[in-house]
Amino acid sequence: MTDLRRKKPVRAKSLSTLAIHAGEEPDPTTGALTPPLHMSAAFRLPDFGPSLFDALTMESQQPPFAYARWGNPTARALEAKLAALEGGEAALALATGMAAVSALTFTFLKAGDHVIASEVCYAGSVELFGLHLPRQGIEVSLVDTSDPDQVRQALQPQTKLVYVETPANPILRISDIEAIAEIAHKAGALLAVDSTWATPCLQQPLALGADYVIHSATKYLNGHGDALGGVVVGPAAGIHRMRKEALVHLGGAISPFNAWLIMRGLATLPLRMARHSQSALEIAHFLDGHPAVSRVVYPGLDSHPHRDLVLGQMSAAGGMLTFQLAGGLGAAITLAERIRLFTYATSLGHARSLLFYYPTDLYVDAATYLSAAQKARIREWTGEGIVRVSVGLEDAEDLIADLDQALRARSAKGLVGPAAYAALKRIQARSAQETEE
């Protein structure tokens, strides 16, 4: 006869074990090993008494379920697993990575406060900091967080939050989490780290002193490219405050189905990250010697400017790399046309390998929230443009062969594309000028 009693919570140190067991247990009614998917929007409330009031006011950190935007059993299971993987007290799962960033900032910042943030990070995040928070009366300093002195110099009496993304999207700058945590805490500020590119398998921000760690769960945590999600992990009291103030009021609730899909993906995260990292290193070495490539940036190469920090802070270098093409935009157009195993797409962390070209004039020069000095610093990493690569789970030799044939190819669009792009920019500039006049 099947024993359907609940097991005691899993206590393990290994990420591989936690990725499979944390937050999960056999269903107490059926014995099913796969966690159930709870798609209900509403739940039967407890009888009149303390539990009912807790469900309606969310006074406890795990109140009875009342409404799916406030909490859901599937999302709660995902939160337990993510908290265990990051070594945090609690986690809040949200609809997207940007919902996670927004929940953090709008919970802990108000008009008159000051935040220091990485000048290079995910586009949605840096645009939130550079464009939207100032409109709410929140002062923002965007700095190169790979230089702790810039963080220290940017501190103000009203600094409440330091926000770091490391490795930084898309240029792969690395920031010293431990050093910045010390700087932030001495000033009475919180430190939040977006660790999406590293995952808890390669980097543990909370253990290095961060207060909160953020992920776009859409990427590596899910791993299959089929579900949006985000998460913030940190102290239980702060996470509970975010749940009451940001999740309930701003509405970035994760779909239970997406939570279920991400939880499914997490079971293989340690294995996938090892494969991503191994293959990315092989591809980085190949590209580093290719005649069509002028520069490769990958944390696993000795040539990376922050290689010593990588060795001390990360257990492996991850699945993301960038490279510059000797042939510039024309070569990038040809590359996008001729790849076969790689897919030309902007996301990352999938089983399928992806790449995308970022022209510096479009993604850096046009950023109104960056100073001329900041743009010049970023150009030291990007040149006129970079190809960002998300190395998937295919065989590394097959991926190298695909890149090699595409890099050696020539195409008509690649020949005429740069001139057409320059003409389009002139037309857009003239149109903008006429609109201003």
Model-derived features: where do they sit?
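Conserved small-domain helix->loop->beta segment predominantly found in fold-type I
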Residues: L281-L354, A372-W381, P418-K425
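Conserved PLP-enzyme active-site core in the AAT-like
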Residues: D3-R11, A19-H21, E25-P28, A90-H290, ...
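PLP-dependent enzyme catalytic core of the Aspartate aminotransferase-like
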Residues: T2-D3, E89, G130-L131, E139-S141, ...
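Glycine-rich beta-alpha junction loops
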Residues: E24-P26, M39-L45, W197, K219, ...
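C-terminal core of ALDH-fold dehydrogenases
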Residues: A12, A19-P35, G330-S371
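Short, well-ordered beta-strand elements within core beta-sheets of diverse protein domains
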Residues: L261-L271, G318-A326, R388-G392
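Conserved N-terminal alpha-helix of the aminotransferase class I/II PLP-enzyme fold
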Residues: A42, D47-A99, G124-L131
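N-terminal glycine-rich, Lys/His-bearing helix-loop that initiates the first secondary-structure elements
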Residues: M1-Q62, L415-V416, A420-E437
